[in-house]
Structure formats: structure tokens, C-alpha cells
């Protein structure tokens, strides 16, 4: 009679397999979680890190937690991902510096058994799930505010940002609205301010020099918009208004400031977003996949009219 192939397996391999099974079972517990995001100098990403750490410690009080800033450098973030995986992180929340460029690092992490949740922005490479604001909705809300304020006619600029899906979706959402209003003239839409205050100041300074008359500015996030506002002050320009995205503390303060050109911001909730991402990741570690691999969190437009009722980000 032919001996079954499994019986030919050496005893040492069978013993090794017996040792591996409990190890894999133990890995289903959240033991080491990490976040890598674009810029921990941005309060938005600080809240993502805080929300993730709080939820991770709710899931497992003994969890090891790491938060890193990629500074929007995909090569830096690639190294961070590889180092996190090699150090034993079994859950990584990824705020991609480049949604396409980070794909190889995501694939390596997945191959090593690490659960990867894209947070705030999408990422290629086979992430387990994506948790982010409805960024297209944010762009649509911002653009509709501009159209309504200008009665459908005016000259505007879009101050763009890094090549990540959240920014791309916001701009696409804004263009959805602007294209329905042919008397809205977009004078610039491709200048990358890096998602930062300093970048907004730099790009807007150049745009003000190139455009002697503007009616409105759509900045892809609040730090960019605040930088644009500073550029306007330095150039002694005040004929236009600015709309951002985030609902950040600085954005809310700008809405309350009489001297600011900042007028509206679709509000996100980075703390709650990160908590949801950790919750989803912890369940995936247990073998429970979410009903949808993309979870979109609605945004709400905050303006000068309702900012006093705005409670701000979850803390």
C-alpha cells in the first residue's frame, strides 16, 4: 500500500509546525501598532496619531505604539514601513505620502503578515482596508460655497497639494461643481503647496503676482489656506476669500477672526477616523473582515455663520 505523503514528513518538521500554530494564533492579538503619516507638524496628523494610540490601548493596554512622520517623502515612508514590519508591528495605519509610490512597501508588509489600513488617503499595494473622510464630498462642499458666494461667476485659483488620493479627490469634487458653472474661471489648479502653511504662503505669493484680480481661493487643506491668507496680508490684497478643508482648530480660529479672508472649511474628524481604522484593523487580525474595504466618513461645512456652534475635532 502506498504510504500517504504526509507520513513521510520528517518528525522535526512536524514538531516545528506544532510550534508555529500557537505563534500564529498569538499574532491575531494586537501587540504592536504604528502610524506613519505625512507631517506630524500638522495638527490634523497629530490627532490621527492620538486617536490611533488611544484606541490601540483600549484594545490591548500593553500594546507597543509608534507614530512617525514621513514629511511627505515616499522614500522615507518606504523605509519606515519596512522598519516597522521588521520590528514586529502587526498593524500599521498608513497615511500615504504617495498613494502609488508606497505600493511596494505595502506589498512587503502584507507578505510579512502585517495588517495595513490606509487612513486619510488611499494607498495601492493591497491594503486590508481604507478609512478616510469623504474627500470628494469635501471638495464639492467647498466649491459649492464658492459658487454660491460668487453667484456663479468669478475668477478663482485652486491651491493644490501632494499626489495622494485625499487631495486628488477634493480637487475632483471641486471640479465636479465648477464645471457646472461655466462663468467660474479657474486661473490655476496645479500648483502643489505641499499641504502646509509655508507652502500655501509660497504658492499664493506667486499666484498673487501672476493674477492682479481674484475672487476666491480653494485650498486643499486648512494649513494651506492659512498660508494663502498670510500671503494676501503681506501683499495687501483683500478682494477675494479663501475656503480650506479640515475644520482644524486653526481653521476655526481663522473663521472667527475679522481680519481673515478665510470663510469656510468642510470639517473632518481625524481622531475618530484613526480610532475607526484601529478598530477595523484589530478585527481583521482576529479574522473578521469589514463589510466594505473602504469606509467613508461624511464631512460638514463650517462657515463664519455656524463656527460658534462647531465643537471641533474629537479629542
Question: Language-model segments: which ranges?
Answer:
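A residue-level marker of the well-folded mature domains of exported/periplasmic proteins
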Residues: 4, 24-315
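Bacterial N-terminal signal peptides
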Residues: 10-18, 22
Amino acid at each position: 500500500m502506498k504510504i500517504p505523503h504526509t507520513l513521510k514528513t520528517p518528525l522535526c518538521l512536524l514538531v516545528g509546525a506544532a510550534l508555529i500554530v500557537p505563534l500564529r494564533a498569538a499574532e491575531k492579538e494586537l501587540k504592536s501598532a504604528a502610524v506613519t503619516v505625512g507631517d506630524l507638524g500638522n495638527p490634523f496628523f497629530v490627532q490621527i496619531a492620538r486617536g490611533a494610540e488611544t484606541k490601540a490601548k483600549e484594545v490591548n493596554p500593553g500594546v507597543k505604539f509608534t507614530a512617525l512622520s514621513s514629511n511627505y517623502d515616499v522614500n522615507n515612508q518606504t523605509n519606515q514601513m519596512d522598519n516597522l514590519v521588521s520590528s514586529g508591528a502587526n498593524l500599521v495605519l498608513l497615511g500615504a505620502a504617495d498613494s502609488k509610490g508606497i505600493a511596494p512597501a505595502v506589498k512587503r508588509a502584507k507578505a510579512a503578515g502585517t495588517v495595513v489600513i490606509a487612513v486619510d488617503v488611499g494607498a495601492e499595494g493591497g491594503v486590508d482596508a481604507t478609512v478616510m473622510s469623504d474627500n470628494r464630498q469635501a471638495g464639492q462642499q467647498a466649491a459649492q460655497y464658492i459658487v454660491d458666494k460668487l453667484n456663479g461667476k468669478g475668477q478663482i485659483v485652486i491651491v493644490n497639494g501632494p499626489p495622494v488620493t485625499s487631495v486628488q479627490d477634493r480637487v475632483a469634487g471641486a471640479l465636479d461643481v465648477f464645471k457646472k458653472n461655466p462663468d467660474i474661471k479657474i486661473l490655476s489648479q496645479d500648483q502643489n503647496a505641499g499641504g502646509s502653511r509655508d507652502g500655501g504662503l509660497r504658492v499664493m505669493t506667486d499666484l498673487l503676482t501672476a493674477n492682479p484680480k481674484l475672487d476666491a481661493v480653494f485650498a486643499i487643506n486648512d494649513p494651506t489656506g492659512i498660508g494663502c491668507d498670510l500671503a494676501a496680508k503681506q501683499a495687501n490684497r483683500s478682494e477675494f476669500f479663501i475656503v480650506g478643508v479640515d475644520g482644524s482648530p486653526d481653521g476655526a480660529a481663522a473663521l472667527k477672526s475679522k481680519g481673515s479672508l478665510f470663510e469656510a472649511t468642510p470639517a473632518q474628524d481625524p481622531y475618530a477616523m484613526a480610532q475607526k481604522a484601529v478598530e477595523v484593523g484589530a478585527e481583521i487580525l482576529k479574522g473578521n473582515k469589514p463589510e466594505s474595504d473602504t469606509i467613508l466618513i461624511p464631512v460638514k461645512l463650517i462657515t463664519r455663520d455656524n463656527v460658534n456652534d462647531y465643537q471641533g475635532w474629537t479629542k
